[in-house]
Amino acid sequence: MTTLDQFATDKLARLEAGALRRRLRPTARAPGAVLERDGQRLISFSCNDYLNLSTHPAVIDAAIDAARRHGAGAGASRLVTGDHPLYCALEARLAALKQTEDAVVFGSGFLANTGIIPALMAREDAIFVDELAHACIWAGARLSGAALHVFRHNDLAHLAELLAAHRQAARHAMVVTDGVFSMDGDLAPVGEMLALAKAHDAWLMTDDAHGIGVINEGRGSAHGHDVPLQMGTLSKAVGSYGGYLCASHVVCELIRNRARSFVYTTGLPPAVVGASIAALDLIATDPAMCAAPLAHARRFCAALGLPPAESPIVPLLLGTAERALAAQAVLEAAGFLVAAIRPPTVPEGTARLRFAFTACHAPDDIDRLAQLVHDRILVTA
């Protein structure tokens, strides 16, 4: 009989053999782009804190004040006694930024998607998902029990073909996509996708985890389109923690009643909620700050002759996990931290370096990084 420890050891050995084992590495962050790891100071291009708001004095002060006034924890599910007034203020800020009637806050983006999708979809329904959608979208879709149809990445013709073939057999239909794709940095064609969904009587849901705060003056990838379900996170450009859904009031009320990851979860800590409110206020009033990460990504792309970035995320595909790890080591030795992304996070054969640009990156550091990538990685590829 295999013991649990033996089972785990064998699994880890297989991951190690494929250069796919991951390890936690304690990392000390400070204001700005510099961090310390294993005694080395590194300029990080691997952080999703795109606006550096997690260390903004106003955001920190708001977190401290909320904790002092409301305590360290919510104390209960929001449907019991955990619905402090701060939550209503946060949801109002989100709805205002996204220009929707209402919003619902979740404990994380993963909890949001695994709660929203099963609350709206069931076995009699059909879900159409972009093949590169985030893992939590897949988790939510599978939990729902609905028929799952996968369309090629950003391929509207393939989506139309699948809708034509499968929509009529389903009670309800939902099209789900990332607004900004977290590993490729490209944007979904939201306007065209919305028109296609409406033509087939389907609901469109966008995951804007990497769009809020940095696309369309901070309003996100769905801005300007009447997308009925706009989901996202508070843990990236907002610099805090949590997930959300922006939608109509009646849809949000249904989610508050039916999303299991909302109903059966203690509310976010007041400090997190206070920090998120302060960050959203900064995003709403500083479009120049919101534009900086994309401008920095485009500066990097121009220096390397790459196509202009669509978001603060720039991938450099290297193929194998071994090559990606070797490239990461080259940059780390020179004082830059750029994460190697390997399967299963990305498809087999597409391991890459993922460059994430923030508002505080200095132009000189971006230029030095681009030169290093050119000389030590691209030239030797």
UniProtKB/Swiss-Prot annotation:
Functional description taken from the UniProt entry: Catalyzes the decarboxylative condensation of pimeloyl-[acyl-carrier protein] and L-alanine to produce 8-amino-7-oxononanoate (AON), [acyl-carrier protein], and carbon dioxide.
Reactions accelerated catalytically: 6-carboxyhexanoyl-[ACP] + L-alanine + H(+) = (8S)-8-amino-7-oxononanoate + holo-[ACP] + CO2
Cross-referenced InterPro entries: Aminotrans_II_pyridoxalP_BS, Aminotransferase_I/II_large, AON_synthase_class-II, AONS_Archaea/Proteobacteria, PyrdxlP-dep_Trfase, PyrdxlP-dep_Trfase_major, PyrdxlP-dep_Trfase_small
Cofactors demanded by this protein: pyridoxal 5'-phosphate
Protein name: Putative 8-amino-7-oxononanoate synthase
Record-listed N6-(pyridoxal phosphate)lysine modification sites: K236
Gene giving rise to this polypeptide: bioF
Record's subunit section: Homodimer.
Binding site for substrate: R22, H134, T345
Natural source organism: Acidiphilium cryptum (strain JF-5)
Keyword terms: Biotin biosynthesis, Pyridoxal phosphate, Transferase
GO BP of this protein: biotin biosynthetic process
